[in-house]
Design a protein with these regions (language model features):
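Short amphipathic
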Residues: 9, 225-233, 404
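Short, surface-exposed beta-strand/loop micro-motifs that present aromatic residues
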Residues: 17-20, 177, 227-232, 392
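N- or domain-start disorder-to-order transition segments that initiate the globular core
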Residues: 1-26
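Short, acidic/polar N-cap/turn motifs at the starts of alpha helices
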Residues: 3-7, 219, 229
Length: 425
């Protein structure tokens, strides 16, 4: 879908993107605050941000309860949600074009004028407890926060987070909202048919009842190499594994595009070098690899599930193919195929207003950078074998990594798999 992007900076310190999608019949809203778990005041109330997010659509200045607010918000089919991460709290909504202003007003009252109540707090503490307990039955959810911890990130696992819920008091919720929900800490992306509406939207956002504050700095952790770690689960008859490598700098956009193509070559399809080879031999039903750029560090991750009896053979393939990349063994034919795939996926990724909004929001909420949708094809075509290989070599050269797994197997088996990877460094 054709669209144009304008960045606006409001007098109250808020910033955001207004994305005009001519002819769109849907409006999409996203509002982000640096208000996630890392900004909670004390570790013993770590889950405060998450519980507050659950309470965000409860009683407020205009509605006495969550049920009353929900009934009004959704009466014409509109959707809303919120989510919390280590750094962010994000409020999202989608609605029919004809009611965009009503929905924006309803978001305003929920975000700016909540009336946090003790009854709601107790209910949402129970709901969050149920949510996190459910995650403990998902071995991938159990694994990756532990990987973060092992590398040195100052985060809690879901089990640790569960133990902090009882400590949260109503004043903790109120304090976290006052601290984080300020106009200077707010970023937004609004997408839809905006012709003739931009000034009204800006005026509405300028009137939001948020105090001035600050855009919080992203905390920095010192990352380190860690020993292979097994999370023992007697019910885990296979191995859920994660191999994470860290590089002590933010890789640039060109390097990230190159790593995306490299990961496609390695694990992206049924005919890929690692996943495709494993599937052909019946060794693993599914696995992935991906690279990401953080504020101070970048990561290259491999993960998946494998039966214990076939894990050695899968890791032999992983080690062999990563070694081949380090040795420069990527063909122009493989590069061209990966570029063609990336170009197609890019074009398919802007079919809806929400997809367009999401293309911009992740990066914009992170560091304020406005991606250029039209230049992505050029960036993909400019990917080179040399950049892929050099970036992969830099990850290996940093030697900051860990292998972790969830299984009923033993530590000795995981250490044996780790030894196969160790030879790459």
């Amino acid at each position: 879908m054709k669209h144009t992007v304008t960045e606006v900076r409001l007098d109250n310190g808020s910033r955001g993107l207004l994305i005009d999608v001519p002819g769109a019949t849907v409006m999409s809203f996203q509002f982000q605050f640096r208000a996630g778990n890392r900004y909670v005041g004390r570790k013993n109330i770590y889950e405060t941000a998450h519980v507050m997010e659950h309470m965000s659509f409860g009683a407020n200045a205009k509605f006495s309860s969550e049920h009353a607010y929900e009934a009004e918000f959704t009466k014409n089919g509109a959707y809303h949600n919120a989510w919390t991460s280590d750094l962010s709290m994000v409020y999202v909504a989608d609605c029919a074009d004809f009611e965009w202003d009503r929905i924006l007003e309803l978001q305003q009252v929920a975000i700016c004028q909540p009336r946090f109540q003790q009854e709601s707090l107790e209910a949402e503490k129970g709901n969050v407890r149920s949510e996190l307990t459910g995650y403990l039955n998902n071995h991938g959810r159990v694994l990756w926060p532990k990987v973060q911890q092992l590398l040195g990130e100052d985060v809690y696992t879901f089990w640790q987070r569960l133990r902090t819920i009882d400590n949260i008091k109503l004043e903790d919720i109120q304090r976290h909202h006052r601290k984080t929900h300020t106009s200077d800490n707010m970023r937004f992306v609004i997408a839809g048919k905006l012709d003739g509406r931009r000034e009204q939207i800006k005026s509405m956002l300028e009137s939001w009842e948020l105090p001035r504050g600050e855009r919080f700095v992203v905390p920095r952790d010192v990352l380190k190499k860690a020993a292979p770690t097994l999370i023992k689960r007697k019910e885990a008859t296979n191995l859920t594994f994660g191999w994470s490598m860290s590089l002590p700098r933010e890789i640039n956009d060109a390097e990230l595009e190159a790593m995306s193509c490299l990961n496609h070559i390695l694990t992206g399809t049924m005919h890929s070098r690692i996943f495709g080879a494993a599937r052909k031999k019946g060794l693993a039903y599914g696995m992935f690899s991906e690279a990401s750029a953080g504020f101070y560090d970048s990561s290259w991750d491999f993960g998946g599930q494998v039966n214990v009896e076939t894990a050695d053979r899968l890791f032999d393939i992983i080690a062999r193919e990563v070694r081949a990349v380090l040795d420069g063994q990527i063909s122009e034919k493989e590069l061209a195929a990966a570029q063609s795939y990336a170009l197609g996926r890019h074009q398919m990724g802007a079919q809806t207003v929400a997809q367009i909004s999401n293309f911009y929001s992740g990066r914009y909420f992170g560091d304020g950078f406005v991606k250029d949708y039209e230049r992505v094809p050029e960036a993909i075509r400019n990917i080179t074998r040399e950049r892929m290989i050099a970036t992969a070599r830099e990850f290996i050269g940093a030697d900051t990594w860990v292998l972790a797994g969830v299984s009923a197997s033993d530590q000795k088996s995981l250490t044996r798999l780790n030894d196969k990877l160790e030879k790459l460094f």
